Amino acid sequence: MPINRINPSTAMRSASLKFYLICLLVICVIGWSAGAPSPQLSRKELEDRYRQKPPVPDERDADAELDSAYDRNTRRP
Amino acid sequence: MTALGLVLLSMMGYSQHMQQANLGDGVATARLLSRSDWGARLPKSVEHFQGPAPYVIIHHSYMPAVCYSTPDCMKSMRDMQDFHQLERGWNDIGYSFGIGGDGMIYTGRGFNVIGAHAPKYNDKSVGIVLIGDWRTELPPKQMLDAAKNLIAFGVFKGYIDPAYKLLGHRQVRDTECPGGRLFAEISSWPHFTHINDTEGVSSTTAPVVPHVHPQAAAPQKPHQSPPAAPKV
C-alpha cells in the first residue's frame, strides 16, 4: 500500500488560499464599516442636544441649509 | 395685484415684534402669517441690523416639496425650522420669510433680523424662501405674486431699501439654489442684479453643490394641531 505523502505544492496553494480569504474578509469588514450609516439621533436626542447648546453668537457667515453650527470649526474657508 | 397686496399687508399692521397677524378682515389675515400661526419654536437668540435692507435674496427649499394647503405649508415651515435648529444647530430658521404654494407669506426671522441663509449677506438682506423644488418647474403664480408683494410691502414700510438689489442664493454661494427655473424667473424681475468682482463677490456661473439635505427626522411626538387655516 503506497504511503500518502503531503505534496509541498499542494500545501503551498492551501496556505495562499487561506491568506487571500483572510485578506478578502478584512476588506469586506472595512468596506462594511465605512459604508454603514452612523446611527441617527432620535428626535428627542436632537432636541436635548439643541437645548444644551448655547446660542450661536454670530450668524453673519451662516447658511442654515448648507452649513452646520455643530461643525463650525471645521467649515471650509 | 401689487397695489392690492400692499393695501392688504398694510391693513394687517405688520409688527416687528411678531404679533399675531389677526388684524383686519379675513382676507387680510390670509396674506401674512405670524410665527405663532405656524407653530414656530422660540429662537435661541435674535440679533437685529440697522436700516432698510439693501439686498433681497431668493431661495428654494428643495425639500420640503411644494405645499398647497395652509396646514401643509405650516408643517413645511416647522420642518425647515427643525432642520435648521435641531440638525444644523442654528438659532432659528435661517430665512426671513417663507412663501407657500397656498400663496401665504410665513414669517421666519422677519425684517431687520440677522438671518442665516446667505453668508456675508445675512446682516444686510431679506431672505425669502419659496417652498418647493424649483429647478425645472416654475412656482405657481400665487407664490410669485406673494413674493413680489412681500418685497413691495418691505419697501413701502421702509424695511427694504427702495434701491435694493435682488439676488438668487447661487449668486452669493456655490449652490444650485434657488433652482434653475426660479432663478431664470427672478432674473427678469425689477432690481435683479448681476454681481461682479467690483462688488467684492463673484457670481457663480456653474454651481457644483446641489442644494440637497435629508428630510428632517420624524417627530416622536405628534405636534399640537396647527391653528385653523385663515379664512380666505
UniProtKB/Swiss-Prot annotation, chain B:
Top enzyme category: hydrolase
Keywords: Disulfide bond, Glycoprotein, Hydrolase, Immunity, Innate immunity, Metal-binding, Secreted, Signal, Zinc
Pfam (any one): Amidase_2
EC number: 3.5.1.28
Signal peptide range in chain numbering: 1-15
Residues annotated to bind Zn(2+): H59, H169, C177
Physiological role: N-acetylmuramyl-L-alanine amidase involved in innate immunity by degrading bacterial peptidoglycans (PGN). Probably plays a scavenger role by digesting biologically active PGN into biologically inactive fragments. Has no direct bacteriolytic activity.
Name the record gives this protein: Peptidoglycan-recognition protein LB
Organism: Drosophila melanogaster (Fruit fly)
